Amino acid sequence: GSALTVRHADTKYKPVSLPPGVIRFQMKRRTMTPILENEAASLFVLNGFAEGVNDLRLVEFHSKANALTDASMEIVAAVSEDHGSGIIIHNDAQHFSAGVDLNAFRNYIERKDWNGIDAFLRRFQDAVCKLKYTPVPVIGAPSGLAAGGGFEVLAHCDKLVVHTNSVMGLVESAVGVVPSGGGIKETYLRWFNETHSWE
């Protein structure tokens, strides 16, 4: 891809420069090789990006619209086991994740494979719960849309560093589905802990 440029007052386009200490993963990714990868997500080791920060793991979703599938959640579950000194879940795509792949759900429904739906949801819930209880810091760094399952992955992170263009939420009811990846529980727990912290 071409470098990001901005037009200056002298009508010349110049490359956008990043402030000191700011790193765009998209630029670094070109020279990195994932330690684990499938058709929907990749797992990278980050070393030397900041002073004293080494052995971080970064998960990047890269399916169509970053829709979450079994393959995506395999990488999320894997990073919970091989977590290094910390985990970052991020990508520089237009959308962090448009949620769970509804085409996969439609296929389950068309086949009347209700056990398949239950098994998928169990795997999704297991992966995000492993992420939540990983003994290292887990940082979610979304940009763009983080809907449904994408939001539910982020809800299980310890901290979020959210881009100003981010739109997040549980949108399942718009398509007639109840959110089932733990996002309702995590949203409630955060709200409860914040509103009752004074007691």
Where is each model-derived feature located?
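NAD(P)-dependent Rossmann-like dehydrogenase/reductase catalytic/cofactor-binding core
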Residues: 1-53
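A glycine-rich phosphate-binding loop feature that marks nucleotide/adenosyl-phosphate handling sites
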Residues: 1-12, 90-95, 140-151, 158-159
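Conserved catalytic cores of soluble enzyme domains
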Residues: 117, 125, 129-199
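A structural preference for short, pocket-lining loop segments at secondary-structure junctions
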Residues: 56-61, 73-115, 122-141, 163-167
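Intrinsically disordered, low-complexity coil segments
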Residues: 49-55, 194-198
